[in-house]
A protein has these predicted regions:
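Active-site beta-loop-alpha junctions enriched in small/polar residues
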Residues: 21-23, 59-63, 87-90, 135-137, ...
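Histidine-acidic metal/acid-base catalytic patches
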Residues: 1-52, 120, 166, 185-207, ...
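Glycine-rich, positively charged N-terminal anion/phosphate-binding segment
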Residues: 29-46, 65-85
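Short glycine-enriched loops at secondary-structure junctions
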Residues: 84-91, 126
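Glycine-rich, proline-tolerant flexible connector loops at the mouths of alpha/beta enzymes
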Residues: 55-76, 138-142
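Active-site acidic/histidine proton-transfer and metal-coordination neighborhood
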Residues: 2-12, 77, 94-204, 214, ...
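A short acidic, helix-capping loop that chelates divalent metal ions and anchors anionic groups
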Residues: 26-29, 93-97, 138-143, 178-180, ...
Length: 339
């Protein structure tokens, strides 16, 4: 289980987790002649072939159709641990109008109870991290919602699931929109406001790099704010063009911002896994090779972070807010001094 109480330890670069559904990509090649979607264990077996991968995140209830402890054992036999569970609110069609914020009390109760079952399942599987992405909680039209009432429902729901098991960490993953036009948890500041109102010690934030980008935030700044007012419980690395949730490979577009984020979370004492929330399945990429490249990319970036932290010139230039010098130093340490 993860221990987030000791904030003096540096980021452990050896724990890498990934999105299980990525390994359904190119199913016709991996499982020729098979009709239908691959099973959870088929995808897990494929993921286990990724060099350097240590963990998986499981969606609840989608990936958990058997005893959680038995599922954990099977994954352990493959050499994989469970980093955490992530809630999905698709089982009830009414959730399209909201999970914790649905206008009907019975639907809200269904969503909250489903989350509690997910927390119990995560604990049975040996994990103490539950990520909640409340993507259905939001609105699409002017005059659609009573904003104060909707916000109160959200706060009440989050508080109740936090109180269900105070030893389980609950991490809010924010996202500006999609599937709703406006999400109730769209950015770092709003999420931190909610966390302050909830007041639960086991509550924190998951930073998804692509979500942060199209929330028009600087990832390292968002991480610093969260560390100041709460804590980062999860880091989802990917990349994109800051217009939507592209799910591109790590460093494909925003290399410097990714390095800066890794430096920031290391300085703030993040101890969790680095999770790859990328979408190789959208275009049929080889998910094993894609994940291996992501791991190698982050390992190289962490070496750059090591060099940056050992270079007194950078700290001095940052203290002066001398952006020309900081860019020169970072580029030199990334690509070499020769030209």
């Amino acid at each position: 289980m993860h221990n987030f109480t000791n904030w003096t330890n540096a980021l452990n670069p050896t724990r890498f987790a990934t999105r299980l559904n990525s390994f359904a990509s190119g199913a016709h090649i991996a499982w020729p002649g098979q009709s239908g979607k691959p099973s959870v264990m088929q995808m897990a077996e494929r993921a286990a072939s990724v060099e350097g991968l240590t963990d998986l995140d499981l969606n609840y209830p989608d990936h958990v159709s058997e005893d959680p402890a038995e599922l954990s054992r099977k994954l352990g036999d493959l050499g994989l641990s469970i980093n955490g569970f992530a809630m999905r609110y698709y089982t009830n069609p009414a959730f399209k109008l909201g999970a914790f914020t649905h206008p009907a009390e019975d639907v809200r109760r269904d969503a909250i109870d489903l989350t509690k079952k997910g927390i119990d399942a995560a604990r049975e599987a040996g994990s103490n991290l539950m990520t909640i992405w409340l993507g259905q909680d939001g609105f699409d039209y002017a005059f659609q919602a009573d904003y104060a009432k909707m916000w109160q429902h959200e706060i009440d729901g989050i508080r109740e699931v936090c109180e269900h098991d105070t030893d389980c960490l609950i991490s809010i993953e924010y996202k500006p929109n999609e599937p709703r036009s406006y999400s109730l948890m769209p950015d770092a500041a709003t999420t931190l406001l909610a966390i302050k109102e909830v007041g639960a010690r086991n509550l924190g934030v998951t930073l998804d790099f692509a979500h942060v980008l199209y929330a028009d935030e600087q990832p390292a700044f968002a991480a610093a704010l969260i560390a100041r007012h709460s804590r980062v419980l999860g880091v989802h690395l990917n990349d994109g063009y800051a217009k939507r949730d592209d799910g591109l490979m790590v460093g494909a577009v925003h290399t410097l911002q990714t390095v800066e984020l890794l430096r920031q979370i290391r300085r703030d004492g993040y101890e969790g896994a680095i999770y790859f929330d990328t979408f190789p399945d959208l275009t049929g990429l080889d998910p094993v090779h894609e994940c291996e490249v992501n791991i190698r990319t982050v390992q190289r970036m962490l070496k750059v972070v090591d060099r940056l932290e050992q270079d007194n010139r950078l700290a001095s230039a940052i203290d002066r807010q001398d952006s020309v010098s900081t860019q020169a130093i970072v580029q030199e340490l990334m690509f070499g001094a020769d030209y």
